[in-house]
Structure formats: structure tokens, C-alpha cells
Amino acid sequence: MKVVGTMFFKDNKILIDKPRKRATYQMVGGGVEEKETPLEAAIRECHEELGPKALFDESNFELIMDFDEIATSDSSKKIHFYVYKYNGSLKGTLTESEEIEKFLWYDSSYGIDILSNTLKNEVIPYCLTNNLIK
């Protein structure tokens, strides 16, 4: 299974979202559909999760890392995760939906208990090491 996530940054914080069906925050992203590239999936998921009033340039996505991990929901399932960094400013308004309960501009002052395993184990350490968040 292939999954994508996109990192948006503002004021040394990363944008994460809280799905209504999950206890933890995750990256903006989701599954790669059949006949779709990871980049196409990342762009589609950003449109879906951020809502119609969020504005971003689709040419500003950069693949930063990819790795394998075990699915939190099913330990027998292996996931290949692609992480993109958005090189620009996210404009407009973020819109909650049936799927997404809320958004958070995260920095380390929030701690790690609210984070998905992918954020906790891979993404946030990368962001801290590269001075992308505080």
C-alpha cells in the first residue's frame, strides 16, 4: 500500500489535521489510488483535506523522504510512505469537513502524545533536525 503526506510550514510550525475517526493528528494526506503517481495523490489529498478555499501552487511540491512502516490499524500491513514538502505559503482558508475535525499548526510545545506514529517517529524528528519547526 502506498500513502502520501504533505508538509506545509508557517512560522516554524507544521500543519497537521485531526480526522474525526482517529484519536491522533496526522499529516495532510492519504492513500495513492490506482494509476495515480504519489505526487498526483499528494495534490489530490491536499485539495480534499484542506477544502476548496485553501490555495496552493501545485508546482511547489518536493519529495523529501520515503520509507516503509507498519500500519497502525493493522500490524500485518506494510505501507510505503512518501512525504512531500510544500515550498511556498499556503493561502486562503482551511475548511473542516466530514472527514477532518480540525487543523493545528504544530510545534514541539504540544508534545508528541497527540501525533500519529508517522509524525512521531519520522516526520517531526526530520523537521526538528532540519530546523523546520521549533
Language-model features and meaning:
Residues 27-64:
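The catalytic Nudix box helix
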Residues 28, 34, 70-71, 100, ...:
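Functional cleft and adjacent loop/helix regions within the main domain
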Residues 17:
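Conserved active-site beta-strand element of glycosyltransferases/polysaccharide synthases
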Residues 23-25, 96-134:
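Nudix hydrolase/Nudix homology domain
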Residues 1-14:
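Conserved N-terminal beta-strand and adjoining loop/helix that marks the start
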Residues 2, 65-93, 104-109, 126-127:
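Active-site-adjacent beta-strand/loop module that shapes the phosphate/pyrophosphate-binding cleft
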Residues 21, 38, 90, 111:
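A generic "binding-loop/recognition-motif" signal
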Residues 11, 20-22:
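Short strand-connecting beta-turns/loops that link adjacent beta-strands
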